[in-house]
């Protein structure tokens, strides 16, 4: 019974850590805490945001942080909500799991002539790996269900972010 109880407790701890890492991803983005955001990933990481125009690729963690920060730093504010986590552990490898989660991303771009709001709904498939530093996202795939509002907001925010970097 003790071994079984220990295994069950460890599985619950793993679930909590995986879920927290996915939430920290969203919090890091919204706080513009790129260290927190980057710490969510392995290095390298496979990132597939092709539904939003960023081609799927295996990149360094720093490259992913650079791409995402450039895309989002130009927004006035964002709020990324990641609910409904379903975690499936690899039956052949206790150090691997997949976390499926919903995504609700709100973006505010004050002063845009094309509309200040851009809303995005969808989901993520996060392939997780247990590392010496805890559970990390090894592969992230974004799936978009629908979007509403200023669909040029991301491109506008990138322009603003790049202009701010140059000045």
Across the structure, where does each feature detected by a protein language model lie?
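Short, low-complexity N-terminal intrinsically disordered segments enriched in polar/charged residues
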Residues: 1-27, 31, 35-43
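A beta-strand edge to alpha-helix "cap/lid" segment located at domain peripheries
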Residues: 2-6, 73-167
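A structural signal for alpha-helical segments
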Residues: 13, 56-59, 116
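Hydrophobic face of alpha-helices
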Residues: 19-22, 65, 121
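A solvent-exposed, acidic/Ser-Thr-rich amphipathic alpha-helical stretch
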Residues: 34-104
């Amino acid at each position: 019974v003790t071994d079984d109880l220990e295994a069950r407790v460890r599985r619950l701890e793993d679930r909590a850590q995986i879920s927290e890492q996915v939430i920290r991803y969203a919090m890091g983005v919204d706080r513009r805490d790129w260290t927190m955001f980057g710490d969510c990933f392995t290095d390298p990481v496979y990132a597939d945001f092709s539904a939003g125009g960023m081609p799927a690729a295996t990149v360094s963690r720093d490259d992913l942080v650079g791409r995402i920060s450039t895309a989002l730093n130009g927004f006035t504010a964002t709020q990324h909500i990641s609910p409904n986590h379903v975690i499936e552990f690899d039956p052949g490898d206790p150090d691997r799991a997949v976390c499926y989660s919903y995504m609700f991303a709100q973006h505010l771009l004050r002063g845009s002539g094309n509309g200040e709001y851009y809303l995005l709904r969808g989901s993520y498939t996060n392939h997780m790996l247990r590392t010496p530093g805890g559970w990390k996202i090894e592969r992230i795939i974004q799936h978009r269900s629908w979007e509403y509002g200023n669909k040029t907001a991301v491109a506008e925010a990138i322009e603003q972010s790049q202009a701010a970097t140059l000045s």
